[in-house]
UniProtKB/Swiss-Prot annotation:
It comes from Methanococcus vannielii (strain ATCC 35089 / DSM 1224 / JCM 13029 / OCM 148 / SB). Binds 2 magnesium or manganese ions per subunit. Mn(2+) 2 binds at residues 294, 296. The keyword Signal does not apply. Its cofactor is Mg(2+); Mn(2+). Mg(2+) 1 binds at residues 282, 294. Pathway: Purine metabolism; IMP biosynthesis via de novo pathway; N(1)-(5-phospho-D-ribosyl)glycinamide from 5-phospho-alpha-D-ribose 1-diphosphate: step 2/2. Belongs to the GARS family. One of its GO terms (biological process) is purine nucleobase biosynthetic process. This is Phosphoribosylamine--glycine ligase. One of its GO terms (molecular function) is ATP binding.
Length: 443
């Protein structure tokens, strides 16, 4: 069974590992970097830019895969799924128009407004800096609300700035909005939203165009440093619980979030056509219930490293179910295990990360600790592993109890050497209790 995988990060390493549990899978990967984990699982690799449509087509024509899976968001944004589908290849990953649920924040917010989907918030979209933008922010100030400034396009998870975190106040938000337009960050168009107050969580679904099958809820940790301090990153780590819920998230609020995602899938289909792929909702649990912060048209990273290792059902079957609209005939199950994932990242990340420095990985000790190792933004050069400036590698601990899963991950993550750092508090009792207390305060 020939499977084409596009992408070379830790998320794609997790996808590759899940696929290879089925011994019939022959993996062919197109990635820009030599990720040693994916490379070792692949029969053949094409080293090319993951948004190069011509190279994707060339590689697909050469290997003639029976299934294609697109990992990152960037290839989705340039129509990789459209191309592969037109070639007659069953593809996991939404086409360019449905993928706008991630690639265009304006599309997402307008969709919620048009179809009256719950969980939205006050927002406005702007093509230029001017009086209207300033007026909207001033109105938010008058309502006693802080704002969030989001470049409308893709920024690798690092373009969003929030008042009270990266921005001092709403006047500071105006200055950042001006900078976005001047530097054309994320396409030079922005969304200004009211700032939500609460606790974040993520919810994933397998989507086959009609049906959505939900995965366990996960909590990501986007801040760079312990105790949720420092700049926003692509995610420093995440945890999930053995009951597939989260300790601060009531059952009825989880059900509300699921309903929001179901309505979103239906709205996407009505607006631009069916969505076939992984859908990841980033929510804020507020005193008024769950609100959607944003959607991603692919697996979350790091969340993929929590979810895929505990998937009991054959991932290959799930992927075919997604691509052919047949998920309702598959019994998708996850192990009742807790997971904790932690990332090592370059010093200076995400503002000014070191690059092209060697990282040493003691994989034997990581294995002894009982953790799973995932390689991310690294490149294998002349037998050495070099960091490329983004998150470098991740480890996941899995156990019956979250305390034990956290210990496995922590015992493993100390087995890296180089100009790197990590968060030691992810999955700890202290940090989880902080989330619980935060929700009690709000409610």
């Amino acid at each position: 069974m020939k499977v084409l995988l596009i992408g070379g990060g830790a998320r794609e390493h997790a996808i590759a590992m899940a696929l290879k549990k089925n011994r019939s899978v022959e993996l062919y990967t197109l990635m820009k970097n030599k990720n040693p984990g994916i490379y070792g699982l692949s029969k053949e690799v094409s080293f090319n830019n993951e948004t190069d449509i011509d190279k994707i087509k060339e590689f697909a024509e050469k290997i003639r895969p029976e299934l294609a899976i697109i990992g990152p968001e960037a290839p989705l944004g340039v129509g990789a799924a459209d191309l592969l589908t037109e070639m007659g290849i069953p593809t996991v990953g939404p086409k360019k128009l449905p993928a706008q649920i991630e690639t265009s924040k304006e599309f997402m917010r307008n969709l919620f407004k048009k179809y009256n989907i719950k969980g939205s918030l006050k927002y406005a979209a702007f093509n230029e800096y001017g009086e209207n933008l300033e007026k909207f922010i001033d109105e938010m100030t008058g309502l006693g609300k802080d704002v969030v400034v989001k470049p409308a396009g893709l920024t690798g998870g690092k373009g969003v700035k929030v008042v009270g975190e990266q921005l001092k106040n709403n006047d500071d938000a105006k200055l950042y909005a001006k900078e976005v337009f001047e530097k054309s960050i994320g396409g030079g168009k922005i969304i200004v939203e009211e700032k939500l107050v609460g606790v974040e969580f993520t919810l994933h679904g397998f989507v086959d165009g009609e049906n959505i099958v939900f995965m366990p809820a996960v909590q990501d940790h986007p801040h760079a440093y312990n105790n949720d301090e420092g700049p926003i990153t692509g995610g420093m780590g995440s945890y999930s619980c053995s009951n597939h819920k989260l300790p601060f998230l009531p059952d009825d609020k989880l059900d509300e979030a699921k309903e929001i995602m179901k309505e979103t899938v239906n709205a996407i289909k009505a607006e631009v056509g069916p969505y076939n792929g992984f859908l990841y909702g980033q929510f804020m649990l507020t005193k008024d219930g769950p609100k959607i912060i944003e959607y991603n048209a692919r697996f979350g990273d790091p969340e993929a490293m929590n979810l895929l290792p505990i998937l009991k059902t054959d991932f290959l079957d799930v992927c075919f179910g997604i691509s052919n609209g047949n998920l309702d005939n598959i019994n998708i199950e996850f192990e009742n295990k807790a997971t904790v994932c932690k990332y090592v990242v370059p010093n200076g990340y995400p503002i000014c990360p070191v690059k092209n420095k060697e990282i040493l990985v003691n994989s034997n000790e990581i294995e002894k600790a009982g953790a799973i190792l995932f390689y991310a933004s690294v490149n294998e050069e002349n037998g050495k592993l070099v960091i490329t400036g983004s998150r470098s590698a991740a480890v996941t601990g899995i156990s019956e109890r979250i305390e034990d899963a956290e210990k496995i991950a922590q015992d493993a993550i100390i087995n890296f050497e180089g100009e790197i750092f990590f968060r030691s508090d992810i999955g700890t009792k202290k940090l989880i209790e902080k989330r619980i207390e935060r929700m009690k305060e709000l409610i």
